[in-house]
Amino acid sequence: MKKIIHKAASRGYADHGWLKSYHTFSFASYQNSERMNFGMLRVLNDDVVQPEMGFGTHPHRNMEIISIPISGALSHKDSIGNKRSIEVGEVQVMSAGTGLKHSEFNDSKIDAVNFLQLWIIPEIENITPYYNQKIFEALERKNKFQVLVSPKDRRVGGSLSINQQGYISMIDLDKGFEIAYDLRNGAYFFLIEGEVLIEDENLEKRDAIGIIEKDKVYIKANKSSKLLVIDVPMI
């Protein structure tokens, strides 16, 4: 087994006024040669967008982009005809492929939006861009792994599909609950809330651990916790 630990305080940080962003991996002005990626996971940003602010229209190409709201709602528009709102409990997937443009905006006059954005390197380049989003019921992840995203050729249940052999799961853990996660590739465990013990490493809010070369990973919740698991090829 090999593991890498990323404490919350070790992340890059940028304060643009309208946007406060924590970067797990090198992104924009935050550049760290030892924090470029975890396998095919290239970006994990923890963003807070202020009321009535947002990301103007900008392009992407050949990247799988997954957004997961933690609080608040974002209005989405893109160049392939989608105009949607994405809220807590939903997951959004964009496969940028040959290229698309999009914007994300916080329409609220009062509340900030906190969301996670993940970029995963695609398996096949220059595919036709596509977009999807879905509501995932919280009860389906209570003390069990709920698969949010899976490969388009090996889709799991009602999960959203991406152009990569990657899986993204979420679990809401009760205090004291123990569970094992079966690795498909390498897995990056990002703790959204709470406190957990993973392979003898104590993780608190926004801490993370990446694990490879192991079949099962053992998890125990020291507090009620919300855990995101990003399982991706390492090469």
Where are these regions (language model features)?
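Jelly-roll (double-stranded beta-helix
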Residues: 1-235
